[in-house]
């Protein structure tokens, strides 16, 4: 089994940090649903401002709030205004990677979705893997795909 990216929220702005909480990250259910992130699912969080990398679980906040709140010990790693990348994963047999279509949402500073992307892995007749990033229309994007400044 291989650990593979299942979905990603790229460039969310942290809206809060609550040290006096049991733990987790609070996210807008609309963002989670669109990226395929479940409540109580463990996610990796990468802070683009500090470089901190942590793992915690998701709890759902208020629908439509565009919230991104680090709770408990995680609040020490991310502060309001920091930009983060949140990624969930799935374990699959290597051959099944071609069936996955991870959703990637990118955001502006107000946590509004600015783009919806899909990752795609294919395999050619010689068995070599190929990777593509596609936009909402299915058009292939250049790799590496540069993140637009928000």
Swiss-Prot record:
Keywords: Autocatalytic cleavage, Cytoplasm, Decarboxylase, Lyase, Pantothenate biosynthesis, Pyruvate, Schiff base, Zymogen
GO CC, any one term: cytosol
Pathway(s) annotated for this protein in UniProt: Cofactor biosynthesis; (R)-pantothenate biosynthesis; beta-alanine from L-aspartate: step 1/1
Positions annotated to bind substrate: 56, 72-74
PTM summary: Is synthesized initially as an inactive proenzyme, which is activated by self-cleavage at a specific serine bond to produce a beta-subunit with a hydroxyl group at its C-terminus and an alpha-subunit with a pyruvoyl group at its N-terminus.
Modified residues (Pyruvic acid (Ser)): 24
UniProt protein name: Aspartate 1-decarboxylase
Organism the protein comes from: Xanthobacter autotrophicus (strain ATCC BAA-1158 / Py2)
Lineage, broadest ranks: Bacteria, Pseudomonadati, Pseudomonadota, Alphaproteobacteria, Hyphomicrobiales
Gene assigned in the entry: panD
């Amino acid at each position: 089994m291989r650990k593979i990216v299942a979905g990603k929220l790229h460039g969310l702005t942290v809206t809060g940090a609550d040290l006096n909480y049991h733990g987790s990250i609070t996210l807008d259910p609309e963002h989670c649903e669109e990226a395929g992130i479940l409540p109580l699912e463990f996610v990796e969080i990468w802070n683009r401002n500090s470089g901190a990398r942590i793992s915690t679980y998701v709890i759902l906040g208020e629908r439509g709030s565009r919230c991104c709140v680090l709770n408990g010990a995680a609040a020490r790693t991310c502060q309001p205004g920091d930009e983060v990348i949140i990624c969930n994963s799935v374990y699959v047999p290597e051959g099944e990677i071609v069936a996955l279509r991870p959703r990637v949402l990118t955001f502006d500073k107000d946590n509004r979705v600015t783009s919806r992307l899909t990752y795609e892995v294919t395999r050619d007749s010689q068995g070599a893997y190929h990777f593509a990033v596609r936009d909402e229309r299915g058009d292939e994007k250049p790799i590496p795909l540069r993140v637009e400044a928000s």
